């Protein structure tokens, strides 16, 4: 399966159903009153975290997501049905961005509200009053929220295996877990992150084999640089280093990877690190291990052979010990700060601009909402639009800019001819 970890999507919640104008028409009911029902709400769009997914590939082919619209109200005060919600599965670890602002971090297998459906419009029954017993007033349903979003996947793994190409990371992942990562005796066998489940007695954790890193990976060199972001999610970083070759220098390899991680993100240096000295079955292994321990006497190091699966239990014990310490550290530092989805628009300034000779456009979210919400289906509704535009300062703004009589004023798809008559 192709690995995709960043996509752009267009999300659109459902429009609310329209309210209607209706009056009772029944036998033996003289002058029946208003009974127009409200429209149903538009459907919401949710992202659902799914541990069974590990790529955003589905959005690569289908990047438009929309929920159903609500139905219009009906006579006899019958409400329209609500639009069906759209629930989309995404991998755990998916970050949702709107204009570079993080609005959701999908880290749990639950539903995250991404776009709210519009409210249903009110029918004329809702406008009945002592002064107006037979209102010919109703509202259209509100538009659902619509956003252009960027999804970024950062693999959720407890332990990240990092190292130079051909260090044996894929072989180790296969030996430790149920994964079946491709292995071969050449560089860059692993082209995308591979996940596996590591079990040790009654404990378990996820482990990720990340593509091999080379010098200046943090600056974009090699294949591994584009996957460095996945390391940020890990709680423990495990350096897999080839100690079994006379052509490789384990100390230099470790220092190279350490520098790239630091250059990419300073916070990675603060995570627990363990050195996995691989290829203990080779003759030169002991010599290289001795040199490394002399250079870094305090670093935790475990000698193993991924190929022959030697000393893996000791490695598992060391990993889970470090994970436990990392989890305790996280608990002591954690601050409850769930990301709230609150996409706010700029302050709503009332503006007017000239489009052409005798054609002007009003720009304001509030004003646009008025003309979208109130249908021009009755004289009462037209008067209502007129009063609201006046209260919002539209007419005063038009006068201030000396717009000539008879000029066309556009507000979205709504337009009228300007007259200064009260």
Swiss-Prot record:
Detail which positions bind GTP: 163-170, 188-192, 209-212, 278-281, 305-307
Give UniProt keywords alphabetically: Cytoplasm, GTP-binding, Hydrolase, Magnesium, Metal-binding, Nucleotide-binding
Q: Where is the OBG-type G domain?
A: 157-324
Q: Name one GO molecular function term.
A: magnesium ion binding
Where does the Obg domain start and stop, copy by copy?
A: 1-156
An example of a Gene Ontology cellular component annotation for this protein is: cytoplasm
Q: What is this protein's gene name?
A: obg
Major subcellular site: cytoplasm
Q: What does this protein do?
A: An essential GTPase which binds GTP, GDP and possibly (p)ppGpp with moderate affinity, with high nucleotide exchange rates and a fairly low GTP hydrolysis rate. Plays a role in control of the cell cycle, stress response, ribosome biogenesis and in those bacteria that undergo differentiation, in morphogenesis control.
Top EC class, one word: hydrolase
Residues binding Mg(2+): 170, 190
Q: What name does UniProt use for this protein?
A: GTPase Obg
Quaternary assembly: Monomer.
One GO term (biological process): ribosome biogenesis
What EC numbers are recorded for this enzyme? 3.6.5.-
**Pfam families xrefs:** DUF1967, GTP1_OBG, MMR_HSR1
Q: Which cofactor does it need?
A: Mg(2+)
């Amino acid at each position: 399966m192709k690995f995709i970890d960043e996509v752009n999507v267009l999300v659109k919640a459902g429009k609310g159903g329209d309210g209607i104008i209706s009056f009772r028409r029944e036998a033996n009911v003289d002058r029946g009153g208003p009974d127009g029902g409200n429209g149903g709400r538009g459907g919401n769009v949710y992202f659902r975290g799914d541990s069974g997914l590990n790529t955003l590939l589905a959005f690569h082919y289908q990047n438009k997501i929309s929920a159903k619209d609500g139905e219009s109200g009906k006579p006899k005060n019958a409400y329209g049905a609500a639009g069906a919600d759209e629930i989309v599965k995404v991998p755990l670890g998916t970050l949702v961005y709107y204009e570079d602002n993080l609005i959701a971090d999908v880290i749990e297998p639950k539903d995250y509200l991404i776009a709210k459906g519009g409210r249903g419009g009110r029918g004329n029954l809702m406008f009945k009053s002592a002064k107006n017993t037979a209102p010919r007033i109703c509202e259209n349903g509100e538009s659902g929220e619509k956003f252009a979003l960027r999804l970024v996947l950062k693999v959720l793994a407890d332990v990240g295996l990092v190292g130079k190409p051909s260090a044996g990371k894929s072989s180790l992942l296969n030996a430790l877990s149920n994964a079946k990562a491709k292995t071969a005796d050449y560089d860059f066998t692993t082209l995308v992150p591979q996940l596996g489940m590591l079990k040790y007695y009654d404990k378990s954790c996820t482990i990720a084999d990340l593509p091999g890193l080379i010098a200046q990976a943090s600056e974009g060199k090699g294949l591994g640089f584009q996957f460095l972001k996945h390391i940020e999610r890990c709680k423990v970083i495990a350096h897999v280093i080839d100690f079994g070759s006379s052509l490789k220098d384990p100390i230099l390899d470790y220092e190279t990877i350490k520098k790239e991680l630091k250059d990419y993100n300073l916070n990675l240096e603060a995570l627990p690190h363990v050195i996995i000295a691989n290829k203990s079955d080779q003759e030169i292994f002991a010599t290289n291990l001795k040199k490394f321990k002399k250079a870094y006497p305090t670093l935790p190091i475990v000698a193993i052979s991924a190929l022959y699966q030697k000393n893996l239990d000791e490695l598992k014990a060391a990993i889970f010990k470090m994970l436990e310490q990392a989890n305790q550290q996280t608990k002591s530092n954690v601050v409850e700060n769930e990301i709230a989805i609150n996409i706010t628009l700029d302050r709503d300034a009332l503006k007017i601009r000239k489009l052409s000779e005798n054609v002007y456009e009003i720009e304001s979210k509030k004003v646009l909402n008025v003309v979208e919400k109130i249908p021009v289906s009755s004289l009462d509704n037209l008067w209502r639009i007129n009063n609201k535009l006046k209260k919002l300062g539209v007419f005063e703004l038009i006068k201030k800019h000396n717009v000539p009589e008879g000029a066309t004023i556009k507000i979205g798809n709504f337009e009228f001819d300007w007259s200064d008559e009260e």
